[in-house]
UniProtKB/Swiss-Prot annotation:
This is Preprofallaxidin-2. Expressed by the skin glands. The keyword Endoplasmic reticulum does not apply. GO terms for biological process: defense response to Gram-positive bacterium. The modification Leucine amide is found at residues 65, 89. Residues 31-41 have a biased composition (Acidic residues). Residues 1-22 form the signal peptide. Residues 23-49, 69-73 form a propeptide. The lineage of its organism: Eukaryota, Metazoa, Chordata, Craniata, Vertebrata. Residues 24-49 are annotated as: Disordered. It comes from Litoria fallax (Eastern dwarf tree frog).
Length: 91
């Protein structure tokens, strides 16, 4: 009877140890996935910021053109396109 209790205790102990190891690995994997998602989000934010800065610059140039309406219209269309791309990056 005593050897049965020892065997049962050993099996339970080893089972708990393996479960705790699995839980630890699972938490580490989730942490790595969260870090990757944050890095991707940061990269997207940087790209979006760069595109919005470009659009602002283009709009500034278009406003300085004044009477040259065709060139101005083309630049404003380009700026709208850039802003559209930047808004898609944010999603």
């Amino acid at each position: 009877m005593a050897s049965l209790k020892k065997s049962l205790f050993l099996v339970l102990f080893l089972g708990l140890v393996s479960l705790s190891i699995c839980e630890k690995e699972k938490r580490e994997n989730e942490g790595n996935e969260n870090e990757e998602e944050e890095e991707n989000h940061e990269e997207g934010s940087e790209e979006k910021r760069g595109l919005l800065d470009l659009a602002k610059h283009v709009i500034g140039i278009a406003s300085k053109l004044g009477k040259r309406s065709e060139e101005k219209r083309g630049l404003l269309d380009f700026a709208k396109h850039v802003i559209g791309i930047a808004s898609k990056l944010g999603k």
